[in-house]
Amino acid sequence: MHLVFKFSPEADLETMLKLKVEINTREHESLYGIRQYPFEIDCRWHQAKAEILSFEPEELFGTKLRALLQRRKNRDLFDLHEGLKQLSMDPDKLIACFVHYLALGGKPISRAVAEQRMLEKLDRSLTEDIAPLLPAYIQFNDDDAMDAFGNVWSELIARIKGDPWKLSGQVIDELRKGKIPNLLR
């Protein structure tokens, strides 16, 4: 199931964008269970407190890693990087969730495939699909995207079980000689 929202980004009010929100109604097996989280709204016109049910952060971001590696979109890279920075997640627990949800779907992704797909993402912009979605006060430029790429690579991709992609070293060296001299340094 999905919902589509149309909006104008803050940076360009003349443009209309569509944001598709996908709701996964097929996966019902949680690896770490459901938790309650406090939620509070406090603004001029409404105040409320509630407990909301959700998954552990590692579980949510494990599916985010799966999305990053299964789709051509790069906005998941931003989300993973911010989650790793802000939520003090356990990367090994996140990878366990990633593996769990891949197994449920019957579509495993090895470390070699993960490395190949990540490096292929460098053939196009890492920022173009996220930039219009961010508020004006959040910057995510090409340098930020490369930091995010390196963080996700070292904290998550390198932890996926299996052998590295046999061409990773060669592709990284070529990219360092070309357009990305500081790649994964």
What are these regions (language model features)?
Residues 1-185:
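Structured mid-to-C-terminal alpha-helical surface segments
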